[in-house]
A protein has these predicted regions:
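Conserved SAM-binding loop of SAM-dependent methyltransferases across substrates and taxa
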Residues: 63-72
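Conserved class I S-adenosyl-L-methionine
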Residues: 51-60
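Conserved SAM-binding motif I beta-strand of class I
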Residues: 75-80
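C-terminal substrate-binding/active-site "lid" region of AdoMet-derived donor-dependent transferases
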Residues: 128-183
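A short SAM/SAH-binding and catalytic strip from SAM-dependent methyltransferases
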Residues: 118-132
Length: 183
């Protein structure tokens, strides 16, 4: 293999990786991994129970759904537009023996049909993305579904619980709820 072949191969790999990262950013948010201690805080705040179904919008490397399936014995489903992260997350799920309770689907957050199954929906997206998703969440989620967002809010949903230190916001799927609580 010549030097030019190596350079062209490296450039091709770089372009593929850059394109997948850009695609994820255009369709929801760039990937910013959530530390496990915040993942644990998210799942506690959402009051996730064994056997419930969690849908993580923008699952990234799958750490939240893996934690939900492993530690909470929940049925955890990820939605991810980045094919490499989706592949990696499903590889980790397989490696950890969690395939019966966890899976990441390669689909856009705007096109997923998984929301009606969710008891809990989690999202760490951008403010503009949350605003675009509000109508879909209100139409497709069960009225009892709990929605937890990190950092960015859903402006037309009333916050039920708020953790200002970690910037976590808990909602129910019904618009116009009035009960509020600050942790």
């Amino acid at each position: 293999m010549s030097t030019i072949d190596v350079i062209l191969f490296a450039f091709g790999v770089y372009m593929i990786v850059s394109a997948t990262w850009s695609i994820a950013g255009m369709f929801g948010a760039p990937w910013v991994p959530t530390p496990i201690w915040i993942v644990e805080r998210i799942l506690k705040m959402a009051d996730l129970k064994a056997g419930e179904t969690l849908v993580d919008l923008g699952a990234g490397d799958g750490r939240l759904i893996i934690w939900a399936a492993w530690r909470y014995k929940a049925n955890a489903i990820g939605v991810e537009i980045d094919p490499l992260r989706c592949l990696w997350a499903n590889f980790l799920i397989h490696l950890l023996g969690l395939r019966k309770r966890a899976k990441v689907h390669y689909v856009s957050i705007y096109e997923t049909d998984l929301l009606p199954r969710a008891d809990v929906v989690t999202a760490y997206l951008l403010q503009s993305t949350n605003q675009k998703l509000e109508k879909k969440l209100a139409q497709e989620c069960k009225p009892s579904a709990r929605i937890l967002s990190r950092t960015f809010t859903f402006p037309n949903f009333d916050v039920l619980k708020k953790d200002p230190k970690q910037e976590l916001f808990l909602y129910t799927c019904k618009q116009g709820t009035s009960e509020k609580q600050i942790l």
